[in-house]
């Protein structure tokens, strides 16, 4: 397994543990479709959260917040729409969030990354 993949998994593990500590329940992890991948799908109360996890060792290259490009955001939105269609989830409150992890700092939960 490549180092970046291992670090990515460790970042997802940390993000999941953080979200669970905030009361979230895991529905799916690394969910794939033709449009892309959703790192974590969790339920928080009555809301489904689609979570992009970003991990960086340090602030080099602008930090983790700069790693979610407009094209990545579009892929995520399309993946969310597809997930909702495939699971026949209509009129279910949902949101696209991000958990950013930078080095040894605590995770940062960005809610509603689509604005």
UniProtKB/Swiss-Prot annotation:
GO terms for molecular function: nucleic acid binding. It comes from the Bacteria. Disulfide bonds: none annotated. SUPFAM superfamilies: Restriction endonuclease-like. InterPro entries: Restrct_endonuc-II-like, tRNA_endonuc-like_dom_sf, UPF0102_YraN-like. Belongs to the UPF0102 family. This is UPF0102 protein NMB2089. It comes from Neisseria meningitidis serogroup B (strain ATCC BAA-335 / MC58).
């Amino acid at each position: 397994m490549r180092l970046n993949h291992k670090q990515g998994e460790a970042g997802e593990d940390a993000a999941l543990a953080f979200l669970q500590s905030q009361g979230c329940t895991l529905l799916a992890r690394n969910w794939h479709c033709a449009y892309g991948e959703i790192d974590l799908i969790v339920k928080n109360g009555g809301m489904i959260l689609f979570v992009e996890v970003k991990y960086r060792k340090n602030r080099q290259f602008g930090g983790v917040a700069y790693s979610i490009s407009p094209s990545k955001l579009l892929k995520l939105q399309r993946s969310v729409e597809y997930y909702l269609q495939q699971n026949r989830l209509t009129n279910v409150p949902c949101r696209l969030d991000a958990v950013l992890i930078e080095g040894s700092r605590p995770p940062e939960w960005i809610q509603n990354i689509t604005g």
